[in-house]
Amino acid sequence: MADRVSELFTQNISEKNVSSAYAALKTLAQIIETSSQTTARGLFDELNEARSQILRKAFQISKISSRRLLSVRAGTDMFLYHINKVLSKADNFETCRGEVQLRAFDLAEGQQRSVDRIANEAKQLFKHGMTVLVHGYSRTVTSALELAAKSYHIKVIATECRPFCEGYETCKRLQKMRVPSEAILDGAVASYMGQVDAVVLGAEAIVESGGVINRVGTYTIALIAKQFQKPVYVLAECLKFVRMYPLSLSDMPDENFADFQALPGGEEFQNTRMPLCDLTPPDLITLLFTDLGILTPSAISDHLIQLYNG
């Protein structure tokens, strides 16, 4: 089973414009579709094992690419909760199998719906002549910028976002849509913040406190934005809401750290270890634009309760 799950996940994650989290959900939906289990408990145990295999594969991928692991963990956690909810309410497993499959694929194929909803919600952020700073590469953020650019003349400044330099991917996509954009060094954020009207960020995960886990450097950018009195907006699907309450970087899981080789010229520091993501506290976030609506950071805890107990 392990090889099959790994193969399905690898295939799904390689599809264009499919995030890691939704690739994981599609993999779980495919497991449900082909499962030979005859009991609800058997199916749920099979899904739990498949999730473990997906997380192991996602961890391997995250070490060599910008693919995210925490979003996979959050998304599959929510997916299994809702599938288990359907299974536990059924009197007969065979009669609910079809409903479980429909629910699974509905969750797995919801990425574009969620992204479109957020882009439409976020459109009100923008105005003519606005300059926006972004960090990393987020399909949700770039989709919102592309939609806004159809109505407003905006400019985008993208940080390089090392170590994977995702900022260049952001600029490449935006330039294809004729959205003016330029990449800057991560260390140059303070130099450019004065000409920025707002910071718009994606997220790998949104924790119970309303804090945001995102590419390393996000916390620094939010601190600089506060110093310059610039708003910080986060665009992310509720699939990324996660039942975690980290208080600092030291509370982040070990999988958040990776080893890299320094660039030529840094031989004395050839082996480097760094976090892939950091935690931005809720007091530095102005608003979150989600597929559940526009939320304040303080509202996240209540929405997590609704998502898991509603």
Q: What kind of region is each of these model predictions?
A:
Residues L69, Q112-V115, T218:
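Generic alpha-helix initiation/capping and coil-helix boundary signal
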Residues E7-L8, A23-I31, Q53, Q60, ...:
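Alpha-helical scaffold segments in soluble metabolic enzymes
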Residues M1-V100:
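Long amphipathic alpha-helical segments
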Residues D3-R4, S143, A148-I154, T159-G310:
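Conserved phosphate- and dinucleotide-binding cores of soluble alpha/beta proteins
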Residues R68, T131-T142, P163:
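Gly/Ser/Thr-rich loops at beta-strand to alpha-helix junctions
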Residues L80-L133, K150-V199:
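Ligand-binding beta-strand-loop-alpha-helix segment within the catalytic cores
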